[in-house]
Amino acid sequence: MCIRDSPLIQDYDGRADGILRAVVYRLWSEGFRFFLSGMACGFDLAAAEAVLALRGECAGMELVAVVPFAGQPESFSDADKRRYADVLTAADRTVVLADSYSRGCYYRRNDYLVDHAVRVVAWYIRRNSGTGYTVRRARHQGIEVLNLYEDKMNPTLF
């Protein structure tokens, strides 16, 4: 399972944290054990934190941090840098896809997430975004996408 958000930090403000935790727990109860996070600010980090919070009570649950390039958090706020570092330190595994930033590195990260996912959980608002690309690619490959933005705005998931 992979976790993705729309790239603008203000898109995700924590309003679905409760649903997010419930979804992660439900996926674990369905047999999912490996949760991949793209490590972007916002929903990616919130989802990673939900996995870490549940890991103690969910046997076998693991967080895989998928980092597009070393130095990803350099442009983050100080608070987000600390949050990122905490998640990265606590992750069970880290996959760093490139030594430095290059054009297309975020798409390669998104491709990696989809290529290693059976299901995608996203906070998807805008079609023209990295998350939009990820969602379209997942759906094209027949991978189920749970869009918590839609579920939060029209709560029929639970």
Task: Map each language-model feature to its residues.
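Acidic/glycine-enriched connector segments
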Residues: D5-F158
